[in-house]
Amino acid sequence: VGFFALASLTLPTHAISITAAGSAYTQNFDGLAASGTGMTWANDSTLPGWSLFKQPVQGTAMSTYSAGTGSSNTGGFYSFGASGNNDRALGGLGGGAYFGSPDPGNLAGWMAVSFSNGSGGSLDGFQVSWEGEQWRNGGTASAQTMVFEYGLGSSFSTVTSWATPGGLFDFSSVVNGGTAG
């Protein structure tokens, strides 16, 4: 498993507040570390509103991440980018003990962003867009996919139903097979 992701609409204490219809939120991840391993990650704090979770128990909070260029095959959450460059991307590699050694093709973890309705009224929809980046080819013949889902609840662990709007919202690796790296 090479890539994985999840975005959610939940309402934790540090959720990103949407204060009016048509409000925009952007995140470029450039505030993440550009070098090092074992950096402290605190859900809803390192990046306000963002959380990292892993299997085997849904909702197990992660406490570390590393910076990388895609050259490592060690499973974990990463701040990907060129060495020493502050232009970052949040992602992960799904293998290894970090995620409880998931079987190939199984979900390894979640990257979740939380929003709350701070408008004082009803919000009847939302629009989502992002740019996916591939920082590593795991060498497998099949594409590795980040799946977009959303749910409503007071926290990640209280969401009982996740909606998957379809494959057009997912990101699949564009380079597959060949030599890993």
Predicted regions and their residues:
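Acidic glycine-/aspartate-rich tracts in secreted/extracellular proteins
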Residues: 31-37, 135, 152-156
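Extended, low-complexity, turn-rich repeat/linker tracts enriched in Gly/Pro/Ser/Thr and Asp/Glu
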Residues: 103, 133-143
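Residues that flank catalytic or metal-binding motifs in active/ligand-binding sites
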Residues: 25, 46-48, 109-111, 142-144
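Surface-exposed, low-complexity/disordered Ser/Thr/Gly/Pro/Asn-rich loops and linkers
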Residues: 48-121
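A short beta-strand element within beta-rich, extracytoplasmic domains
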Residues: 123-137
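Boundary/junction segments of secreted and surface-exposed precursor proteins
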Residues: 7-32
